[in-house]
Amino acid sequence: TTQSDEQTPFWLVANRYGWGTLTSSNGAVIAELERSIAHDDARKWGVGYGVELAAARGFGSTLWVQQAFVEVRWRHALLTLGSKAQPMALKDGQLSTGNQALGINARPIPEVRLSLPRYWIVPFTHRWLRLKGHVAFGKTTDDSWQHDFTQGQNRYTKGVLFHSKAGYLMIGKPEQFPFSLELGLEMACQFGGKSFIRQGNQMVEIKNQSGLRSFWNAFFPSGSDATDGKFVNKEGNHLGSWVARFNYDNAQWGLSCYADQYFEDNSSMIHINKNGWGKGADAHKQVR
């Protein structure tokens, strides 16, 4: 791959957990220590951990911790503490262009994550239905970068918390039949911390809510923000995607077709004709 005119090809920065850079002259030295939890697959319980350090030139940072985590598994349930690079659930990180909601373009953040990383067979369904998913709460670590990037003159945030959750359903018996269908919902929310907003010639600091109620409002989208004003909204910045994948697998090769529908509010979660909304007083109502 070559580049010119100071333009970096998309595939050199996407799906790399923040390892992309727009600087033409760059390099990095990486030190890593990891024990994969896969070593304990034969046991009911398992333990894994890892640390990845980076020293770089031509990146946004010169020295940082890319990953630092500990994880414990009991049967199907997995608890992860710390910053770990999580793969996309229904996308191939090497072949696809990424995910619209829970992608892998950014560096991992420190979080507490409870998950079913592998499909769990739903009882009494004759192995036709399987479930997996996760729930996580964490904290963003880009405060200094935001301030430097905006030079403190445009909107930025500090100390923002992060919540993500996802659930996936597989229909099929991949061990017996080559065809299967996977359906899912992915959601994310930024909440808490402080917002710095320009009002006239000055930047105004607004403290967002970050108590236990805010965690509830992030998990079950509800509440409101101090910056909402006259607009009806929920607490935090909520977004997500409906996702689907259709699979064909055999012993030699496999083929998958997938689709996303991104949304940022309740209206976008509904599969409707985009021209089906009213005007004027009915601008936020669906018109049949």
Task: State what each model feature region is.
Residues 36-47, 73-77, 119-133, 170-182, ...:
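Short loop/turn motifs that connect adjacent beta-strands in outer-membrane beta-barrel proteins
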Residues 1-6, 47-55, 72, 79-85, ...:
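Transmembrane beta-barrel strands of outer-membrane/channel proteins
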Residues 3-17, 83-170, 184, 191-232:
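Surface-exposed coil loops of outer-membrane beta-barrel proteins
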Residues 23-29, 61-66, 106-115, 159-165, ...:
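Residues that define the transmembrane beta-barrel architecture of outer-membrane proteins
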Residues 42-74, 87-105:
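Surface-exposed loop and membrane-interface regions of Gram-negative outer-membrane beta-barrel proteins
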Residues 29-37, 68-72, 81, 112-118, ...:
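Residues on the lipid-exposed face of transmembrane beta-strands in outer-membrane beta-barrel proteins
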Residues 176-185, 191-288:
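Long, internal scaffold/assembly segments composed of regular secondary structure
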Residues 1-39, 235:
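Outer-membrane beta-barrel initiation region
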